[in-house]
Amino acid sequence: MEKRKEEFLKIVCQIYMAAILVVLPLYYIPGNGYYKLGDSKYYLYRNISLICMGICLVVQIIAVVKSCLMEKHRRIEQRCRMENCASFGMYIGMYIRKTGEKMIVWCREHIVVTAVCLYGACAVASALASPYGSTAWTGEKEWYMGAVTICLMVGGFLLAAKYSGQCSRILYLGETASVTVALIGLLQKLGYDPLGLLKGYIVGDWEYTHMLTTLGNNNWLSGYYSVMFPLSLALFCKAVEEERRGSSILLGVSNTLVVILLFLQGSDGGVMVASVALWMCFWSSRKKTKLWEALLFLLTGACVGMLLWGKGMQSRGTFDILLQDGIAKRLAAWQGWLLLAAVCLLFCGVHHVLPEKKKRTLRIGVLYGSLVLAAGTVIWYILKQQGSNFAEWGNRRGRLWQMAWQGFCQGDLRQKLLGAGPDCFAGYLGQVLPGGTVLFDKGYFAGSIFTNAHNEWLTTLINMGVLGVVAYAAVFFTAFRKYRGNFMTNMLLFTYGMHSLISFQQVLNAPLFFLLLGICEAGQGQEKLHRTDTDEESIEIA
């Protein structure tokens, strides 16, 4: 009976994973347009989560009730043997003590699960203490990142951690969905619109440049790939290491398309996602010659692809579909892609003929050199910004960050500890700051109320207080500590973590992040059970 229950719950878990990784990013109701895209995706996520988690919860409750009924007679006999009330009290005390000890041991062994559950508990506590009523539970319209959604994300993590098991096929299906999304977006850049996503919009409309594939605007797209691109790269590296040539080529092409889209989508955050994930990939493969060379070929393909897509858009006259005030137009028109591709190929050739010891020295030198170059770029950028108005930085992200910090400082003790309530950022700051979170008085965003700080940590500080920030940080810290040997998880934590500094939680990134963490937790448990077994289904890359 127990085995049948486990098998059934594994099937439910795999259906849930397929819905989140495959269906959710591709889901689009024709005719709904740009502004209903977020709503439709959230309702799909909420309904699928409630159904799958509800089924699992009912099955578990039935199993617990049956177990209690079976042990009922044994417990009655134990109580009948008690000689007096004192002995019964001692029995209860011993039971509580042993249970407490077991819980402490369990929490130590499952530190990531504990941290995720604490994050969910902080969300519930914040919502219970919130003066903003239903908003704290359901969230703001079009965002829906209230306590209910956070609890569903925690539930998704727990479901995957317990029952995801061997799930490589679903991960590859998720990769297929990811590259399909990228291909639709790249076709849009060339003027093709296979799904009619841009129907009704013309050149000059804000939606014309911001409706990116089936994901929405560039912030949503970058958030999605901050989770899925590390998974895609991990699957590619695994195929290369296992010398599966066909899979390596397919996954290499897939990742190349994703990199091109991230460079053309218009947000600096997307370029950062691609750069951080690729650098992490090169760093993790610094001791692996074949993998390093495969990654150089991937980078070469991305450079050639950028050149071809730029020329294609120029010849078809579709440059107007790129964001006019973003980085995409400069990257698409840059003439140095061919030279950069040649440098990558030359480096790959030199690397190939060197002795193994010199290869490793060269790889380490290039990696540290890239770090020095990145640090120099950051320092140059900071010096360049001196004297400018910080409030205008990042399309007025600077002003949002200032607002968030002012709101936190003005809050009372309850506000500082528990926050205003999940997704109550706009409601709280609208009360304590003159003008609320309205940033623009003209243009497309004139009068728009911003519901987050475009920084997950500052948003969490306002919504869930210091306790929420500590719990959220604990998720990252414990995951990095426990899964530090897992290549995919390291990339996921760094890429998503970096992007979270300039972006926000939404239905296309946060649920997927917790789901992949749950899969890593399941893989860690399988590794403990089968230390000497090389499981083909494992996604871990040492």
Segments (PLM) and residue ranges:
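Aromatic-rich transmembrane-lumenal/periplasmic boundary elements in polytopic membrane proteins
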Residues: 143, 184-200, 377-431
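Membrane-interface coil-to-helix junctions
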Residues: 40-43, 47, 111, 119, ...
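Membrane-interfacial, low-structure loops and terminal tails that flank and connect transmembrane helices
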Residues: 2-6, 67-110, 243-246, 320-324, ...
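Short, hydrophobic transmembrane alpha-helix segments
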Residues: 28-42
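Interfacial juxtamembrane loops and adjacent helix segments
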Residues: 194-212, 414-462
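Membrane-interface helix caps and helix-loop-helix hairpins in membrane proteins
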Residues: 135-140, 263-266, 501-508
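N-terminal hydrophobic segments of proteins, predominantly signal-anchor/transmembrane helices
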Residues: 16-32, 53-151, 180
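Alpha-helical transmembrane segments of multi-pass inner-membrane proteins
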Residues: 4-25, 49-60, 120-128, 146-158, ...
